[in-house]
């Protein structure tokens, strides 16, 4: 039976570039892990593909899945739901395949309670001015919504201590490489691999 895969939880403030860094990781990486597509009730943006960038669902459909207990995590953010389908994640991990979750900070904290041995990576902007420029540059939100996102970002950055790693997105390729290095190192963490060496360990404490 294959070892259970590694659950990688990747999050950060809105506009920090999570999706861009994630795409860079998957396009340039030889690591064998699977991207878990999140589900959301927000409007589909130009260029986004249902089932690739997100599963786009109505609010009613999403709330029904919550009632059925079919979400690993979910959160409501600026009037929209975001979440991770549970069945897909467990089936993939059980096959020994690493699963990469790109989710909101609220959702990441829910996952930490349920899967404390997951790897939690927080992507940060260089500073708040740069974050605001990125949000404005997207051209998808009103000034009021952008202001809400900046205030929310401050709250989320304050939760960075709940994560295992913090990586600044000052340049996409560098940020992606840093994330890949973290994932590679986690595969050799003693707590994760010690089970393979049980037969080499003494059966009982030795005395002199």
Swiss-Prot record:
InterPro entries: GK/Ca_channel_bsu, Guanylate_kin-like_dom, Guanylate_kinase, Guanylate_kinase_CS, P-loop_NTPase. It comes from Streptococcus pneumoniae (strain ATCC BAA-255 / R6). It catalyses: GMP + ATP = GDP + ADP. Its EC number is 2.7.4.8. GO terms for cellular component: cytosol. Belongs to the guanylate kinase family. This is Guanylate kinase. Residues 5-184 form the Guanylate kinase-like domain. GO terms for molecular function: ATP binding; guanylate kinase activity. CDD domains: GMPK.
